[in-house]
Every structure is written in structure tokens, then in C-alpha cells.
Amino acid sequence: DVDAISDGKTVHIGAVMQHIEEAGIHSGDSACVLPPYKITSSSIEQINIITKKLAIKLNVIGLINIQFAYKNGKVYTLEVNPRASRTIPFVSKATNTPLAKIAAQVSVGASLDQFQLKPWDQIPHVAVKEAVLPFNKFPDESIFLSPEMKSTGEVMGISKSLGSAFKRACIGAGNMLPISGKVFISVNDMDKLNIISIARDFVELGFKLIGTENTANVLNKNGLSTQCVFKVGEGRPNIVDEIKNKKISLVINTPMGSQSRYDEKAIGRSCIKNGILIVTTISAASAVLRAIRSTSTKTKVRSLQEYHY
């Protein structure tokens, strides 16, 4: 996600942000990180060049938002929006640059040269924007993220590291991070290889693993002791029973297929009722892992002004 301002002659890049969720999930439902943590500097430079060329070619006067996809070192342009985006307040606070105010003045004739604009990538901290999802108010709604936006708000976390910033954003969104207990894992076949390293890191942090049959088999074969539990409808006690009995601390569930989505709905509803954090993508699981790691250090509260002055 890129926010920029153009006066028709020059372009200022407000920030380049990396979504934690993959392309295909609505940007409003995805957490995002500033500065990006998994994009090469050469690719970021390519993104800057594309943004400037598009803004000038489209004769944009004011704000422009562009969404890119990044895969295997290649950059793909998804959409170009010649308008302000929902990330403008986040970027402005993270970089201490009043983008909306500057864009308003540019729109009525001001030049970007009149403003002392600093490069966005010189900020000495990490900022994370997290979506606030209303599933506790709508318990029958599917928690599976998709191109359809479901979030009703956003929060922001700032710190010196990604894990700490994401931890703060999670707390702001009302998601309490576990520090011990059992992690339930049930992932689709496409995610099984990617979950192994994440599961191993949870074990190193002291968590125990529990999973559905296929996922548990994969983890056990890779040297990770994993308890097997029934899916919904297979027998009792099943995973929903385990959640209701407060035996699960965190749920990682990436369903695929009609039966898996049925299970996901029952699992999601139970997690919401019992205040258990659930993540539905591998990338989100990795981010939560970083956040949990950072809980070993004391959280120091600072004002936004202290980060910039």
C-alpha cells in the first residue's frame, strides 16, 4: 500500500506499507507495517518509481493511493486510487507528516517545494495498523477474511521493533495475547509446510501443540509432539469442546472447502464467546508469534509526541 501526494510536477511518497495478510484479503481487514519488513530495498525503489510515474501520467493533483502485490521479488500493480485512503491518518501519525493538510493546499495551487518534506523511510520506529473486527457483535458472521471488508475500525501500535509494535496494536484491538498453554493448529494442505517452522517456534516458547488429524500427523512427523483432537462431527471431545473447556490458548485455522468452513464457523463462534484469539492466515500467525515473543519485555507507554520530538 502506498500513499503519495502529487502537485502535477513532483511527487512525494508519504509511505510504503506492507500488509501482513496476503493479496486477496481486503486491505481494510489486513494489518500493515511501516516500514516494510519483507520487501527488498530494490523493490521498494521500484515501487517508488512506479508510483511517481503513475501520479504524473494520470495528472493527479493531491493524494493518490496505489496497491501493489509483491511475489518472488516482482512487483505487480493491483489498483490506483486518485484520492485519500484510510491509511492517511496512520501514515501521518507514523511519519509526523500532515499529509491531508498538505494535499489540501496542493489541491488549491500550492507546490510541494513549499513544504519541508522528509523521506518516510527515515523514521526510527516501527508502526503497525491493525483492523478492529466486529465478530463479538456479530457471532454468526464468518471470521474467514476475504475480499469483502468486515472491519469497523482500526488501531495503531508504535515501538522500536515489529513484535512490540504488533503486540501494542493487538492490545488496542482488544486481542489478548497468550503467554502459555495449548496452540490449536488446523491448516489446509497448501499451508502445511509453512506452519512447521511457526509451530516449532511456539514449542520453543513453551507452548504445547494440539491439532486435527492431518495437521497433527505432519507436525509429529517433523519432530513436533502434537496431540490429536476430533474435528466437529467426528467425535467427542472435539476442538469446540476443548475451547469451551478453556483448554486452548490460541487457534490457528486456515480452512479450505465447505466442511472446513463449517468447522471454522463453529470454532470461530466458540473462540469469540470464550475470548480466545484466532488467526486464519499463516502470515497472521507469524505476526502473532513475533508479538508473543515481545511479551517477555516490559511494555513502556510513550506519547506520540515522544516518538517524534
Model-identified regions with their sequence ranges:
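Phosphate-binding active sites in nucleotide-utilizing proteins
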Residues: H12, N194-R200, N214-N220
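Glycine-rich phosphate/diphosphate-binding loops that line cofactor/substrate pockets in enzymes
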Residues: I171-V183, F202-V203, E242-I248
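Peripheral docking tails and interdomain loops at the edges
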Residues: F230-K231, I239-Y309
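Short glycine-rich anion-binding loops that position phosphate/pyrophosphate groups of nucleotides
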Residues: R83, N188-M190, P255-Q259
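ATP-dependent carboxylate activation and anion-phosphoryl transfer catalytic cores
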Residues: D1-I179
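Short internal beta-strands
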Residues: F184, G206-V218
